[in-house]
Structure formats: C-alpha cells, structure tokens
Amino acid sequence: MAKWQCELCLYIYDELNESVTWEALPKEWTCPVCGSGKESFSLAASNPPAAASIGVETGSGEEYLAEWRRPADDFEVNMADIHRLAMTGKSIIEPMRTRIPTFSWDDILIKGAQLAKMPLNKTEPIVTQTLIGPAAAFPLILETPVFVSHISFGALSREAKLALAKGSALAKTAICSGEGGILPESLAASWRYIFEYVPNKYSVTDENLKLVDAVEIKIGQSAKPGMGGHLPASKVTSEIAAIRGCREGEDIISPAHFPDIRSKEDLKATVTDLRLRTGGKPIGIKLAAGHIEEDIDIALYAGVDFITIDGRAGGTGASPKVVKNATSVPTIFALARARKILDSRGADTVSLIITGGLRTSSDFAKALAMGADAIAVGTAAMIAAGCQQYRICNTGKCPVGIATQDPALRARLDVDKSALRVANFFKAVTEELRDFARLTGNDNVHHLSLADLCTTNSEISSHTPLEHV
C-alpha cells in the first residue's frame, strides 16, 4: 500500500485507507481538495524510493532513473530543486514568503511597567487612531494602525477582495488595491482605500484618483525586488482583462520600473501630479528593503507623505524561489534603518509604514515601538479571511477560493462570513495592542518606544538601537 501526494495542495491519497488503489483510479479522477489531476501527484516521501515511477509532466524526463528516485536528502537540501531544474529547464515559481528562517520578532521582548513606570488599568482608554500623511491636505485617518496590504484582484478572487474590503471597513481601517487596478465593488465596500500606482498604470484616471483616500507608488516588493509582476493567463478573466486593459486568457507582465521615472526629479514630478489630481490626498511610495537610506533620501526629495518599507520575509502571489530566498533586508533591521534615516533628516511629517512578515499583535506592538506609524499585513489578512496556507497561489487552484479565478473554487468562499472573520481579526489585534500599551504604561499605542523593548538576540542589539537583555 502506497501514499500519493498532490504537489499542489499536499493532499495525501493513502491506498491503505481507500477502497481503490492508485493505479485503479480512473484517468479523469481529480484531487478532492484542489481539483488537480493525477499527473499532479507523486509518491509521498514516506514511501520506499523504489516503489514506482513518478510522473509529473509528460516529456519532462521525470521517468528517467525514477526507480531509484529519492524525494529529498538531509545533507544536500537543494537536491530536489536541482532535479526539478534539470527536468524542466525552468525556474521554480513559488507563492508566499521564503521558507528560509530569518530574524524573528520573537527575539524581541516587551518590557512591562512595574515601579519605575506604572502600568495602566484595563478601564483606562487607549488611543489607537492612526494618522498617515499628516502634512497632506487630507490625511488618511484610521482607527487602528494595522491595515490590509496590497494584494491584487487577479492574484485574489473577486470574493476575497470583497471580503477583505468589507472586513477592513467593519474594523474602520484601510484596504489597498494591489497592483491590478481598482475593482469598483471593493472600493465601494471599503472604509478607506489606498490605490497602488504601478508602471502599467491600471485604473489611473482623474475620476478614480479623486475617489481613493491615498495613493502609493509601487517601486518594489521584498519577495521579488527589482522585478515586475506576472499574472498567468489562467488567472486573466474577462473582468480582470477589462480592468487592466488587456486580453482575456493572456499572460500579463508588469515592467520592473516606471518608464517615465528615471530620476529623482521625475519622481518628484509624479508625486506632485498625483497630489494635484487627488485633490491633496497622501501620496506615498513602496520600497523593497535594500538600499534603504539612499532610496528614502530620493523619496524625501520627491516630497512623499508616507513611505512603506517591505522587508524580508514579505509574501507574494508568485516569485522565482531562488529570488525570494536570496533577496531583501530582514524587516527588523530595515525598520530600524528607515526610522534612523527619517529622524536624521527631520522628516517628522512623513509617515513610516512597515510590512513584510508581521503576523500578530505582539509583532505590531514591537514595530510601533521601533518607530513604525502603521503596519500593512497581507498574509495575516488572507489567513483571517480563510486562507489555509496550501501555498499554491500561483497555480490558480486555491481550494478555499481566495487565490483563484476558478468559479467552482470561488463559490466555496462566503464573502460575508470571511468579512466577519477579517473584522474580528483586526478588532482583536487592536484590543491586544491596547493591552500592550497599558502594560507598558502608555495611553496611546503610538507612544510605545524603544524604551519598552529589549532583545535576546545579539545580532539585533548590535545592529539596531534595541538593548540586549
């Protein structure tokens, strides 16, 4: 009796527990979770290596030496990837963040107030209201410092975008459009909406710019910095094609940079133009954490109202695995460096937003204490909506209907139920942020500071202002 595993959703077909052997299953049989065919299954790692030939892709060379194939090696950890490259001749594409461990927020601890500073009682009110772009004519005001990051309609289903918009609205926080343009129903359902301005300039009209609450110019993201976006043809529905001005069923490629932004003067002209066209809404910029100080100096020259730094390990809908694994400054260090350069430049009216791998209220509290004004969350918001981390976003076969355009899979997602889950998540973490403020003796979550933190990691204490325990 053997076990066969779906390479997309990791479902296991165990012959021991089934009434039909794998070989006896009809050719049209599909995975009960994600709907993939038999060709997407391979022998599970728990089987003996010589159990059978394993087929993934016709003509891929998968059958060659299959009798002796081993799924992995404890010492040569890249063996499976090398075999895959050798068989396909193509780079491995993966969603979500890198699996390689990075510096953890768990290495940072919050110091509770005792005598030197008194904690606050549960009954004492705590301010969570958050101001982004205070120097703008119309600053963005949220009731919590945590909001939904940029994830496009295309990477996500219509239902997922609506659930995130409705859920964030119930919590009186913002949702971002993502790089795929504006889904009108998502904008209408939102409480506050941040539009992502990208090289392909989807949805960039004077009417739309007047409707949104802020605009963020996307320069890069940590999981694939310096690379453009790619939406596979299988995800390009007629509706997505209409929003993006493309053809249905064809791959959509986003450029790696803006063709009309080649200098800091060009960036300044773009910021000025967007500020005028929005009527004075906050204009920001999103940067992958790399040349942090130099990039921030250019952003400040351009006159932005807020800067988003995306650190390692930020997520993505799809990225070359090798790029995701090898790039970007870890979020903790990126935040410390960004705060330092902004302070040294006297940029106290420029809001700092951090994103990339933050999940829980304790992560958020630590980021606020390190100098972030707000936190954008993508994966955490998706999980709140119902994501089960199958990590197959790039295939379009998400079993829970979030990262797919398949009508049958999308039908599994109940917009209102997922919206309530998202709202509950934001409300819960906001209340937990109040608790962290109280236990550190602060009546405002934005008053959390470095004095409230310490670290058990000497690398962090050596390269950030955080003191070691």
Report the location of each language-model feature.
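Glycine-rich phosphate/ribose-binding loops and adjacent secondary-structure elements
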Residues: 258-410
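Gly/Ser/Thr/Ala-enriched C-terminal appendages of enzymes
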Residues: 359-364, 368-469
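Conserved, well-structured core domains of diverse proteins
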Residues: 47-146, 150, 155-166, 174, ...
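Short, non-ligating residues that shape and space the ligands of small metal-coordination modules
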Residues: 12-16, 39-43
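Active-site-facing alpha/beta catalytic cores
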Residues: 143, 150, 155-273, 277-300
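Short, cysteine/histidine-rich loop/knuckle motifs that typically chelate Zn2+
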Residues: 7-8, 32-33, 397
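Short linker/helix segments within small regulatory modules
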Residues: 18-28
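Residues immediately within or flanking Cys/His clusters that coordinate Zn2+
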Residues: 3, 10, 28, 395
